[in-house]
């Protein structure tokens, strides 16, 4: 996990750095990179590497339970069908979707679906899918 630090300025010079406290605020946007995952039969995101991921499916795949999960972490996974399309994605047991039903991905070639997630515990990732994003 990345810790946020604050700069303390005196006459436009940084005089010290410290971690943000509960009473500090952030007045600008914070952006996280979208990290490309390697397409393989089993895809395992490393949540120490990023919060946001992308992958282009070249076949029917399994999204394994991520490594290095931390409760409270959240992010997105952008899933693109290759030029053939109709690729399926199975999900590791940590992924929990509404009503217990995992989404069926869009099937058109080059279509994009997004899965947003929040890590609820060491063994539960609450997830919501936005399908066929255009």
What are these regions (language model features)?
Residues 24-97, 111-134:
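Exposed extracellular interaction/assembly regions and N-terminal maturation sites
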Residues 15, 104, 126-127:
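A sequence-level detector of short linear motifs
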Residues 64-66, 102-106:
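Beta-strand-rich interaction surfaces with strong enrichment in secreted/lumenal proteins
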Residues 1-18, 131-134:
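Short, intrinsically disordered N-terminal pre-domain segments
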């Amino acid at each position: 996990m990345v810790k946020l630090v604050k700069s303390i300025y005196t006459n436009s010079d940084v005089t010290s750095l410290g971690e943000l406290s509960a009473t500090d605020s952030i007045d600008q946007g914070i952006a996280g990179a979208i990290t490309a995952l390697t397409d393989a039969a089993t895809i395992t995101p490393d949540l120490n590497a990023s919060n946001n991921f992308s992958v282009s499916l070249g076949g029917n795949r399994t999204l394994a339970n991520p490594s290095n999960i931390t409760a409270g972490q959240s992010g997105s996974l952008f899933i693109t069908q290759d030029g053939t399309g109709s690729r399926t994605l199975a999900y590791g047991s940590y992924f929990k979707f509404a009503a217990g039903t995992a989404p069926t991905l869009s099937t058109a070639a080059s279509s994009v679906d997004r899965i947003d997630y929040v890590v609820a515990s060491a063994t539960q990732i609450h997830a919501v899918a936005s399908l066929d994003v255009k």
